[in-house]
Amino acid sequence: MRFSDFDLRLAAFGAQPVHRGRIARVWLNGQALDTGTRRRHSEHFLPLALREALPALTAELDGLARVHSEHAGSDGSRLLVALADGQMVESVLLPRDGLCVSTQVGCAVGCRFCMTGKSGLIRQVTSMEILAQVVLARRRRAVKKVVFMGMGEPAHNLENVLEAINLLGTEGNIGHKNLVFSTVGDRRVFEALPQQRVKPALALSLHTTKAELRARLLPRAPSIAPDELVELGERYARHIGYPIQYQWTLLKGVNDGNDELDAVLRLLKGKYGVLNVIPFNSLEGDDYQRPDLERIREIVRYVHSRGVLVKVRNSAGQDVDGGCGQLRARATGADQVVTLRRAPRPQAVQA
């Protein structure tokens, strides 16, 4: 179910825009639908037909998603979320009141270093199911930032994701720059985002400056050369007034050489953006491994000292074997599941 469908149902119960907005706000804050205002109880505010429908509506909303299991970790608690049809997605409670949500069950891009991509795309996550992940998190703690970096490629579920972003940036009371749309790069994204009422921050999965290598690592991503992707990102960054996050998963011996670093400096120097280097969350038996800690430090120092802002981001859930897609793979017993190895707890990396 999409939120637009739910909104029409509220209208059918006699709810005016002010009533529908109130219902959306209290739900997105994790509160009961009959929560009143400071001055009035809901029985003096909501239409009678809507009040009588609230128990059934509450049951329906609660049935959208539930926490199947919670896995606490030093870098954030990962929630395995069961949807109404039994499919599962993952959400991560991040430090500083952040939340990472999933936008698809599985993913069609098939990134070679991502567990989610191994299962392929199973189905889209609706806007209501995306919002339900936020509701579940807010019933546990405050959520002031939502990043669309969980399972799935948001660009492949654009209507549902944009609808969720619009609700979170209005009725959900989250600042627009604290809503982060993450994508491998799709021209539809650069066409759609500038036209939205709520214009989110943008994270672009760059990973390499070499077009051929990027095509191998992200086999079903749109064919956009890295330099063109950066130019598209720069145009959007200048339009909205906050920087692009360029994502770079560090793979030992693949994209961590000085030739790559020099090339990324040429691409990003002077651009309104930040390079997020993400040491790979190692999987036993996988083709890829993360660079050692000293090499990661060298990379950060090298890039930072030459004028490009760089930050180290570690994939949340490493100490609970919970990198993106891993909990779902274990829970569903997917054929593609490999034996997981806990990566060493990341140490602080000094620039």
UniProtKB/Swiss-Prot annotation:
Disulfide bonds join C100-C324. GO terms for molecular function: 4 iron, 4 sulfur cluster binding; metal ion binding; RNA methyltransferase activity. One of its GO terms (biological process) is rRNA base methylation. Its EC number is 2.1.1.-. [4Fe-4S] cluster binds at C107, C111, C114. Residues 93-319 form the Radical SAM core domain. It is found in: Cytoplasm. Binds 1 [4Fe-4S] cluster. The cluster is coordinated with 3 cysteines and an exchangeable S-adenosyl-L-methionine. S-adenosyl-L-methionine binds at G152, E153, S182, S205, L206, H207, N281. InterPro entries: Aldolase_TIM (IPR013785), Methyltransferase_A (IPR040072), rRNA_lsu_MTrfase_RlmN/Cfr (IPR004383), rSAM (IPR007197). Its cofactor is [4Fe-4S] cluster. Its main location: cytoplasm. GO terms for cellular component: cytoplasm. The active site is at E90, C324. Keywords: 4Fe-4S, Cytoplasm, Disulfide bond, Iron, Iron-sulfur, Metal-binding, Methyltransferase, S-adenosyl-L-methionine, Transferase. Belongs to the radical SAM superfamily. RlmN family. This is Probable RNA methyltransferase BAV1540.
